[in-house]
């Protein structure tokens, strides 16, 4: 069975290689990924289960050039089922042509050798700036 550290390393490697199904296979059937601050830019905060994970990962995999994690740092948690990490991305979003530079912080909880919960924190202004058609202007409500 994989430890949380091994799962996070394998997850980051799979995403960086564009191997969506390999990444999804690391999650428990009811496992998911959560972005607590995505609500601030009107995006769903949680994707749970294989189909929801596919809906999340497909646009990431298909919509960015060179979406590869780098400068990966992994820190032990309270036991082998918990780990935290920091990792960066520097990619280009195809739809907007804008560069996407992001520092993620993540906490992974493993259960029975699978990812039960991955919570990632990131700069949502950078998400909007790089990915939304009009950048951060899309966040401002027009009266």
Regions picked out by a protein language model, each given a short descriptive name:
Residues 7, 19, 56-57, 104:
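Hydrophobic alpha-helical segments typical of transmembrane helices
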